[in-house]
Amino acid sequence: MKMADAKQKRNEQLKRWIGSETDLEPPVVKRQKTKVKFDDGAVFLAACSSGDTDEVLKLLHRGADINYANVDGLTALHQACIDDNVDMVKFLVENGANINQPDNEGWIPLHAAASCGYLDIAEFLIGQGAHVGAVNSEGDTPLDIAEEEAMEELLQNEVNRQGVDIEAARKEEERVMLRDARQWLNSGHISDVRHAKSGGTALHVAAAKGYTEVLKLLIQAGYDVNIKDYDGWTPLHAAAHWGKEEACRILVDNLCDMETVNKVGQTAFDVADEDILGYLEELQKKQTLLHSEKRDKKSPLIESTANMENNQPQKAFKNKETLIIEPEKNASRIESLEHEKADEEEEGKKDESSCSSEEDEEDDSESEAETDKTKPMASVSNAHTSSTQAAPAAVTAPTLSSNQGTPTSPVKKFPISTTKISPKEEERKDESPASWRLGLRKTGSYGALAEISASKEAQKEKDTAGVMRSASSPRLSSSLDNKEKEKDNKGTRLAYVTPTIPRRLASTSDIEEKENRESSSLRTSSSYTRRKWEDDLKKNSSINEGSTYHRSCSFGRRQDDLISCSVPSTTSTPTVTSAAGLQRSLPSSTSTAAKTPPGSSSAGTQSSTSNRLWAEDSTEKEKDSAPTAVTIPVAPTVVNAAAPSTTTLTTTTAGTVSEVRERRRSYLTPVRDEESESQRKARSRQARQSRRSTQGVTLTDLQEAEKTIGRSRSTRTREQENEEKEKEEKEKQDKEKQEEKKESEASREDEYKQKYSRTYDETYTRYRPVSTSSSSAPSSSSLSTLGSTLYASSQLNRPNSLVGITSAYSRGLAKENEREGEKKEEEKEGEDKSQPKSIRERRRPREKRRSTGVSFWTQDSDENEQERQSDTEDGSSKRETQTDSVSRYDSSSTSSSDRYDSLLGRSASYSYLEDRKPYSSRLEKDDSTDFKKLYEQILAENEKLKAQLHDTNMELTDLKLQLEKATQRQERFADRSQLEMEKRERRALERRISEMEEELKMLPDLKADNQRLKDENGALIRVISKLSK
């Protein structure tokens, strides 16, 4: 039964078999001849390796390449040197093998022989002309990698005999690349050839080997920073892989793509050396910031005006250079640039002012010889571009001295990628403006400024959309390392310690710029008012033709320009106003007057400020209703009292004035930096050196006074001020009585006071306006006294930056009486212990820092003041003195302006000094016994402080002793643990030595096995090659 079932299954299998693919196969198996065909080069290398010279000769006769290299770049000669096969080395060299052919790592056969220590092969190779100065990829010569002394001696002797400069040999490749890069840059054509195997470019090589100079030149010549080799590696991959930090930084600064992947999906971070991974991450953050900053920047890098005619021509940089323009704009601009060159060279002869040029980083090594070769160069203008197009940045590039043309040689253009800006320009755009912007500040005369026209101003306002900076104003911009913050701080601190006058047009523009950035609503109005102001100036062209000062928009760009532009100027002489207005505009007038060429008149310069001065004056007039408007011939530094009939200016409405005053006050509150002790000492020393014997008020006093005045004025009403004026008169009478008593009782105290307070009292009584009872004519007459006394004093050259800051704080001379009342009231309240806490807190730090002596009121000062007032009513004599001073203005414009500025600042802030006096000054209203009490208090405080100091010293010594004990304990523990560590290490090393000795015994057996396997391998290869024929 089972047999039947088996047969049935078998039959079914046979049925399924019939017609299957296997059944359809032919019965005779096809015999295909299988051949293993090796590359001729591989066969040749195998034959050489086996030492079969006959086989090698046959292969050479059949056309084999004797210099064939395997995947690692090793040739038969390399292999023979490694195998110590002297016969094969001689055979190959005799048959024409290249004795200096490098492998993939740059090793020539001599490197291999030196590394292995085969003296006979090395001697033979040197005898046949091998290069002992050959350098591999890591910069090593055969001498560097030789390990045996005999080999080192052989190679050293040969180096000495041939006179090879090893250091020069190491830098040979970089020198050649540098030469080629310069050549490409000068010719405007990059003729680079990719590596045959890897597809690497010169940029890859420079990045991988850290040739930073070559890298910069290649990028400048227009190389794509994201170019890839055959494996998809960019230059950043190469630089990161070989750990070249500087090369990575240059590539990132030129906005290379840090996320690019190679053929196997690796970014530069994946292939980077571990040591620079953190640095790469920092660079990535930096590049992200650069990208975001670039997106935010809508304005051009160099903001040019309508046709650059109202500015000096841009000068050449210090190196031999060419101008690189954005490629997509080249065609449309080259002609215009050529035309402009001739015009601006002529203009450059008239205008001797020059731009201080910034040297590019990459040109530092070559720039020393060319520092004196700055000549006019083509400047890029906005006039030939649409309003939405950014003016191109001028990018500099060094040239070889052998290929040097004139600096105004035709502009080269480079074939770069279609729509990209050249990478160097990208780098320049993203650099912080603080460094290169310095090159845009004017440092000399400004004669060329007079050539501007109203139509060009209109075009300029259109192009810059109301926020326009002239080339002479610094630009404060946020950068990666907080340069804005440093700049702002620097601009503020200049007021304290600046020793010299900065040579630039608007010295206060740094501070003004900071304020302007905070008020965007004022910017748009400034562009309109400035254009209108320029049109008004054109009407006065008979005066202004000589040297009109066109104020940059960053200087004084405030709402009060609205007033100045709405007042038509019809005077033939510049008009000045109240002290506040004059003080406000002095920085511009003094800086321009100082820089006017000797032959030109300063009248036009000063008249350009008259509108702003009148605006300030009208502000003060509306506030005080006192006739303080006066005239000044030629210079805005001397005030002619009580002569409003000679002015021809019209005032603006009171509504606009008050609105402007409120707006200005809101953002002019001074911010004081915290000072260290050393800074304070330096500032005090500078102040002492630069002031006269009668100058008692420093810049710090002015700043503190303005703070207090601003706060008190905002909180007090008119009614309170009137009450305080009455109180002030009563207090004066009381004080005079007290002082008379004190004079008889305490003569020694009076002498002390007179000795230390004269510097303050003389200045104050000489320049202070009279009290409110005679606030109209006498106030003007005291101003004339100020003007006449001003020029008799010695010259005081304060820096313009100090003047600019002082001007903002001393605007309230016309309301001196009100402020006196306020200060007296505050003193009284302070003595009753009812004054606000904030005022007391403000006093304390000031008292600690006072270094200019003690200020007192005396009976003599008040009597002198009355005598002064009676003297100043004689107007004719003072006016004579004034005209005398005016004639002197031409020769001392800068110093007199500064002097007037400082005197106004002191008189305006004197009342604040009353509030700031130390205890001894305020106690003179009390009995003389208070001095004894004060002395006892100070004595007790000193004793207390001494006791505290003693306790602190004791604690300090205890702590030092504890620290020494702890240190010694730690040292003992460290020594013990170190001994144990050394013992463990020694045991481990001994075990290791014994293991090595065992392995050393097995070494001969391994060598024998290795040789046998080599022989078998060679035999197999020969058999296979014969079979394949």
Curated annotation (Swiss-Prot):
Positions occupied by motif KVKF motif: 35-38
This protein's domain notes: Heterotetramerization is mediated by the interaction between a coiled-coil of PRKG1 and the leucine/isoleucine zipper of PPP1R12A/MBS, the myosin-binding subunit of the myosin phosphatase. The KVKF motif mediates interaction with PPP1CB.
GO biological process: cellular response to xenobiotic stimulus; centrosome cycle; mitotic cell cycle; negative regulation of catalytic activity; positive regulation of transcription by RNA polymerase II; regulation of cell adhesion; regulation of nucleocytoplasmic transport; signal transduction
Post-translational note: Phosphorylated by CIT (Rho-associated kinase). Phosphorylated cooperatively by ROCK1 and CDC42BP on Thr-694. Phosphorylated on upon DNA damage, probably by ATM or ATR. In vitro, phosphorylation of Ser-693 by PKA and PKG appears to prevent phosphorylation of the inhibitory site Thr-694, probably mediated by PRKG1. Phosphorylation at Ser-445, Ser-472 and Ser-909 by NUAK1 promotes interaction with 14-3-3, leading to inhibit interaction with myosin light chain MLC2, preventing dephosphorylation of MLC2. May be phosphorylated at Thr-694 by DMPK; may inhibit the myosin phosphatase activity.
Chain positions with Phosphotyrosine modification: 446
Residues with (3S)-3-hydroxyasparagine modification: 67, 100, 226
GO cellular component: A band; centrosome; cytosol; kinetochore; nucleolus; plasma membrane; PTW/PP1 phosphatase complex; stress fiber
Record has Repeat as a keyword: yes
Residue numbers of Phosphothreonine PTMs: 443, 694
Positions of modified residues (Phosphoserine): 299, 422, 432, 445, 472-473, 477, 507, 509, 601, 618, 690, 693, 801, 851, 861, 870, 902, 907, 909, 994
Biased composition range(s): Polar residues: 302-314, 540-551, 585-594
Protein known as: Protein phosphatase 1 regulatory subunit 12A
Compositionally biased residues, Basic and acidic residues: 291-300, 318-353, 422-432, 481-491, 614-625, 671-680, 716-765, 813-839, 866-882, 913-927
Principal subcellular localisation of the protein: cytoplasm
Domain of life: Eukaryota
Amino acid composition bias (Basic residues), ranges on this chain: 681-691, 840-851
GO MF annotation terms: 14-3-3 protein binding; enzyme inhibitor activity; phosphatase regulator activity; protein kinase binding
PANTHER family: PROTEIN PHOSPHATASE 1 REGULATORY SUBUNIT 12 (PTHR24179), PROTEIN PHOSPHATASE 1 REGULATORY SUBUNIT 12A (PTHR24179:SF20)
Keyword tRNA-binding in record: no
Chain intervals with Low complexity compositional bias: 385-402, 469-480, 564-578, 596-610, 626-656, 771-786, 883-897
Region (Interaction with ROCK2), start-end ranges: 680-863
Skewed-composition ranges (Acidic residues): 357-369
Gene behind this protein: Ppp1r12a
Annotated segments matching region Disordered: 290-786, 808-927
Key words of the record: ANK repeat, Cytoplasm, Cytoskeleton, Hydroxylation, Phosphoprotein, Repeat
Tissue: Expressed in striated and vascular smooth muscle, specificcally in type 2a fibers (at protein level). Expression levels are 20-30% higher in developed males than females (at protein level).
